[in-house]
């Protein structure tokens, strides 16, 4: 499965009323300035996960990226 843009992920989210948004993993990744650095990268396929996208977040240590998933649970 590849990481897709948040826009495409939200389209998938709206298509499935029973879907939810969860963190794909608990890791934090250094932010590289644009989501384009993450889209297209391959992540392990997990049953029930429809899509994975990168989201920018920020805390007192600075910006970071976290991977979010659209799941059917």
Ranges and model annotations:
Residues 3-20:
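N-terminal acidic leader/helix
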Residues 16-73:
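Acidic, low-complexity, intrinsically disordered interaction modules
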């Amino acid at each position: 499965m590849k990481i897709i843009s948040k826009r495409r992920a939200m389209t998938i989210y709206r298509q499935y009323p029973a879907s939810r948004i969860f963190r794909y993993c608990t890791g934090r990744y250094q932010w590289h300035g644009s989501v384009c650095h993450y889209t297209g990268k391959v992540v392990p396929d997990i049953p029930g996960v429809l899509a994975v996208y990168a989201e920018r977040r920020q805390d007192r240590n600075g910006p970071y990226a976290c991977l979010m998933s659209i799941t059917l649970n």
